[in-house]
């Protein structure tokens, strides 16, 4: 990524990430489609409200993997093979520990968290069952993310795409087999998801154990290396804290939606699956930018990093808004695919039409955050999102949205806080402090 056409490198990296995330989102949607059509609206509500709670427990560690990917990309850009090997094996060690911790925490805390979120009693048993099975196999999600982060750090976004395609096909087949064929409930949907995630993790690690590159994994070398671990945590903890505070704020939003009953939960849960498609270009370019910026700053290509940042941010904005407009226009039909109940469709459509035209604000915030992480300034997006997406969003929900008694006021929490974070990121990005941060840090050391 440090030589040749800037835009080609970014697009070639982002496209496989986009397609991989698309397949991942499709199998999340299939879960909800099968559950909603075969098991009804209460079961759909149980599964549909899952994303925020899962991200609450996984977000901290996934942020640290983002930091690990930046560290590996920097060593890779600087042609430091020994540094790459040390960072890779430290990342794998961290992934194994993280998987065990999240499994235990998820299984034990699920009932308390769901009750705290105000989950209706009619939905609670299915929610607990689904989450406990899901968290029982969460280590496979962590290990796949570990492998994908290593591939992406060295500029390989194709192999994660292949593994997600396999995982998606396995998930669709098992969803239909377990739920439609064997007559299982939400436990069948959860089990299908766990097995499909295990398949993608196994494929990723098999490839990493057989590559000839400096990022090859040797399990006998998997251990924590103190200096590298500190680098991972220095870059990763701000991203992890950022993920966690966003998740906490979104759980508060979800708990406000839960107050309006199972139909609102089912409708908004259906929209959240559709919203994932809006996030595809945003996430793809944010990852591409973090890797591109990391490698080019590692190679001291500062002007190239600046040009790449501008190009990637613009592409992310345009693509996110195109998807947002499409979802806005097709919202009633899209929601009806999950469940035909008019109330479910009405709630999901209302949320979609409140927020989707503002996807460009979400895209800008995430893209600039990707640039900052690649530049080693992960603390900046953490602070911006702590204030805008947590403190202000939760305050708005508690002081304005709940007092109004109008669910649409809950939905407005998202575009309002996206706008505020975009203003903050724009100011910092234009100052340009991020570009030479690593150079100043190395000089000071």
Label each region the model flagged.
Residues 26-44, 114-121, 177-184, 244-273, ...:
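Helix-terminus/linker motif at the lipid-water interface of multi-pass membrane proteins
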Residues 39-52, 127, 131, 190, ...:
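Small-residue hotspots at the loop-to-helix junctions and early N-terminal turns
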Residues 17, 21, 33, 37, ...:
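Transmembrane alpha-helix boundary and packing residues in multipass membrane permease domains
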Residues 12-31, 133, 144, 167, ...:
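Transmembrane helical elements of multi-pass membrane transporters/channels
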Residues 65, 134-152, 160-168, 189-202, ...:
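Short runs within selected transmembrane alpha-helices of multi-pass transporters and secretion channels
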Residues 1-14, 72-137, 181-237, 293-358, ...:
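Short alpha-helical transmembrane segments in multi-pass integral membrane proteins
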Residues 2-38, 52-67, 71, 96-103, ...:
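N-terminal transmembrane alpha-helices
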Residues 44-104, 141-160, 254, 268-331, ...:
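Small-residue-rich hydrophobic transmembrane alpha-helices
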């Amino acid at each position: 990524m440090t030589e040749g056409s800037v835009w080609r490198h970014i697009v070639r990296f982002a496209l496989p990430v986009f397609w991989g995330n698309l397949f991942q989102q499709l199998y999340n949607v299939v879960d909800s489609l099968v559950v909603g059509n075969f098991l009804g609206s209460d079961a759909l509500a149980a599964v549909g409200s899952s994303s925020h709670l899962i991200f609450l427990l996984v977000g901290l560690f996934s942020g640290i993997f983002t930091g690990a990917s930046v560290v590996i990309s920097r060593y890779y850009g600087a042609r430091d093979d020994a540094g790459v090997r040390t960072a890779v094996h430290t990342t794998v060690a961290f992934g194994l520990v993280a998987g065990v911790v999240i499994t235990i925490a998820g299984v034990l805390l699920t009932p308390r968290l769901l009750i705290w979120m105000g989950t209706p009693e009619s939905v609670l048993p299915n929610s607990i069952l689904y989450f406990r099975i899901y968290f029982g196999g969460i280590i496979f999600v962590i290990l796949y993310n570990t492998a994908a982060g290593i591939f992406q750090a060295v500029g390989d976004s194709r192999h994660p795409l292949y593994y997600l395609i396999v995982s998606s096909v396995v998930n669709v087949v098992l969803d239909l087999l377990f739920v439609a064929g064997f007559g299982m409930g939400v436990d069948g949907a959860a089990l299908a998801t766990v097995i499909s995630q295990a398949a993608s993790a196994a494929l990723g690690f098999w490839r990493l154990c057989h590559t000839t590159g400096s990022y090859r994994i040797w399990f006998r070398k998997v251990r924590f290396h103190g200096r590298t671990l500190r680098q991972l945590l220095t870059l990763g903890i701000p991203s992890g804290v950022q993920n966690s505070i966003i998740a906490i704020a979104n759980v508060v939003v979800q708990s406000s939606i839960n107050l309006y009953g199972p139909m609102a939960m089912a409708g908004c849960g259906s929209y959240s699956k559709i919203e994932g498609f809006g996030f595809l270009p945003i996430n793809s370019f944010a990852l591409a930018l973090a890797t591109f910026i990391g490698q080019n700053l590692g190679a001291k290509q500062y002007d190239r990093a600046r040009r790449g940042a501008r190009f990637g941010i613009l592409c992310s904005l345009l693509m996110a808004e195109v998807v947002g407009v499409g979802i806005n226009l097709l919202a009633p039909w899209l929601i009806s695919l999950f469940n035909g109940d008019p109330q479910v469709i009405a709630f999901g459509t209302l949320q979609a039409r409140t927020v989707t035209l503002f996807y460009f604000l979400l895209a800008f915030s995430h893209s600039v955050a990707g640039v900052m992480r690649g530049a080693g300034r992960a603390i900046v997006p953490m602070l911006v999102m702590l204030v805008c997406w947590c403190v202000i969003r939760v305050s708005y929900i508690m002081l304005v949205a709940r007092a109004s008694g109008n669910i649409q006021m809950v939905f407005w929490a998202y575009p309002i806080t996206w706008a505020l974070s975009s203003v903050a990121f724009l100011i910092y990005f234009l100052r340009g402090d991020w570009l030479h941060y690593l150079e100043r840090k190395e000089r000071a050391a």
